Amino acid sequence: MIYPYKEKMPTIAPSCFIADYVTITGDVTIGEESSIWFNTVIRGDVSPTIIGKRVNIQDQSTLHQSPNAPLLIEDDVTVGHQV
């Protein structure tokens, strides 16, 4: 499910793979050739979440951040299962 939060819609590169049952909301940017796997939640509700190119976010991970502290995952990073 991909949806806006406070009028900010996620930006996802066309070459990304987004598995079923993923939730992405708000101020989120996902770079080229990245993959987001089953049951992952990525929130950009209190600060931006920026995911680089060729990033692999594995199953059941939750990515969130604190106010005034954006989350940045640089290029070519793997985030393991259930992080």
Spans of model-derived segments:
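Left-handed beta-helix
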Residues: P14, A19-D20, T25-G26, G31-E32, ...
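Active-site cofactor/substrate anionic-group-binding motifs, chiefly glycine-
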Residues: T49
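Active-site beta-loop-alpha junctions enriched in small/polar residues
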Residues: N68
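Extreme N-terminal tail/first-helix region
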Residues: M1-C16
